[in-house]
Design a protein with these regions (language model features):
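C-terminal single-pass membrane-anchor helix
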Residues: 137-172
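Solvent-exposed, non-transmembrane regions of membrane-associated and secreted proteins
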Residues: 1-149
Length: 172
């Protein structure tokens, strides 16, 4: 679907459809029935991510964002810029802040809180602002290390396994 970039907390993560455990263990999930991450009036995209996984950073540092910070969604060859305008902690069943608001273009990022307890939800909402390409100069062009390691580690394990199997054949 694209990817989200939050330079303040140094993340660049893929956005996948759905919020299954498989999706959330490797990136950010798009909440079903929320607006697709393509922007436009009368839209409200909801993106969810895990916090505190031992194997990945994901949304672990989402609580470090402040009102006025920006995040970017890269989708359909466009860069959508959002300025954080609201940060709230709510109970899991409190969803009023996730509704579409007339004439607004919002994206809300959700993760569990407090860290390690996960009884509430942290909602970080951004309102769409005009993207200025000069803003990109300070932003990372690298994908998070988590994404690199999810490719590198399996390849290394496969290579090691092949070498071991090859050596066992030679010895026999």
């Amino acid at each position: 679907m694209g990817y989200i970039e939050i330079s303040k907390i140094n993340i660049k993560l893929p956005i996948y459809q759905g919020t299954s455990e498989e999706v959330l263990s490797r990136g950010v999930g798009h909440l079903d029935y929320s607006s697709l991450p393509v922007g436009g009036e009368n839209t409200h995209t909801i993106l969810t991510g895990h916090r505190g996984l031992p194997s990945a950073k994901l949304f672990t540092d989402l609580d470090k964002l402040s009102e006025g910070d920006r995040f970017y969604i890269h989708s359909l060859d466009k860069v959508l810029a959002y300025k954080v305008d609201q940060i709230k902690v709510v109970l899991p069943h409190e969803t009023d802040d996730l509704q579409i608001v007339e004439n607004k273009d919002y994206t809300t990022l959700i993760t569990c809180t407090p860290y390690g307890v996960n009884t509430n939800r942290l909602l970080v909402r951004g309102e769409r602002v005009e993207f200025n390409p000069e803003e990109k100069q300070g932003m990372s062009t690298e994908v998070s290390m988590f994404n690199k390691w999810t490719v590198i580690v399996p390849i290394l394990l496969l290579c090691t396994l092949l070498v071991v199997m090859y050596k066992k054949k030679i010895i026999r």
